[in-house]
Amino acid sequence: SSINVRKVLWACEEIGIAYTREDSAPEMALNPNGLVPVMVDRDFVLWESNTILRYLANKWRATSLLPTEPSARAEVERWIDWQATEFNTAWRYAFSALVRRNPAFDDSRWIEASKADWTRMVGILDDALTRHLYVAGDSFTLADVPIGLSVNRWFMTPMDQPSFPAVTAYYDRLSRRPAFLTHGRNGIP
């Protein structure tokens, strides 16, 4: 159910990369943080999901997902980074409380603050999506992988949510992609 693992699996399917998934202690030990995902490509070991996304797109020359033109690439990378630094940070507490039911996240004030910040982030995304079909323009890019999974978490979390029509339309567009149905909109928040 890890959003970070699902990012990598979704990207592999979009790019057409064959992979073997291994969920064992030796693989987790390759990451000094003890977390997944960890990618092993021959003798090269890489961890951090968004870095893995970029590596795969670069290695497989998936320029439709990660453009080479500097401003187009920067737009994609900005949204990838925004997902990791702003969007994830906003939803982490509320999601841990409301979906994972983690007792370490039971402070109602923090839950409400996280929900408010999360809603604000979805509003930022909704505004961007009123101008484009996807987050970095009118074509699906690598940025839509982490953002799409975060949007899935938004819709799967049991809480009151204001209407964000552009985000809803985006979620429906992503749902036309088989890899998103496998790794995103699959009943797993």
Locate predicted features.
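GST-like domain detector, emphasizing the conserved glutathione-binding G-site
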Residues: 1-112, 126
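Active-site-flanking alpha-helical
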Residues: 57, 150-151, 184
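A generic structural-conservation signal
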Residues: 21, 138, 163, 183-184
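Terminal-tail/helix-coil boundary detector
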Residues: 180-189
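Conserved beta-strand edge residues that scaffold enzyme active sites
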Residues: 25-26, 143, 188
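GST-like fold's C-terminal all-alpha helical module
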Residues: 83-178
